[in-house]
Amino acid sequence: MCAEVYHCAGFIASDPVQFPHRYTLKQDIEISGLLTAIMSFGNRKQILKKADELHKLMGTSPYQYVLSRRWEEDFPSGATHSFYRMLSYADFHGYFRRLYTAYTQFGSLEDALNIYSGIPMEKLCAFLEVSAKSPQKKLNMFLRWMIRRDSEVDLGIWESFDRRDLIVPLDT
């Protein structure tokens, strides 16, 4: 029953995965997917509302937004007030700064992650400078979106990672 409900095209419109599905360029999908996944906690309606606000700021191409550095004005590095729940404008500045570095040095986030060792989750945590020891459910969801190809929901655009290396974090 779960697969019929959550792994079909009809699910996309009501889920945060709708945002990366709006794009065709790999870099746009990566940026949209990562930032949307990072925000995916709390009330679903609030997640979708705030993710929509973020995507309006980024305009038609998250990739061009990152490269243009407009995020430096929209998300000042010293701004500690909240953008979404406990995520501050400064937090998003840090995410955009890491993405800017990745895209100016590598062709994609996928390529940037490959400089790190370990399974995909460890690589992504190293890139974001967060602990790989916590469950990181949102980041695992992002990796699923990028790596899995066996669902209408997941985008499956990353070729260099194996879906067998994905993990399902459990609450303890």
Describe each PLM feature range.
Residues M1-T172:
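HhH-family (HhH-GPD) DNA N-glycosylase catalytic core used in base-excision repair
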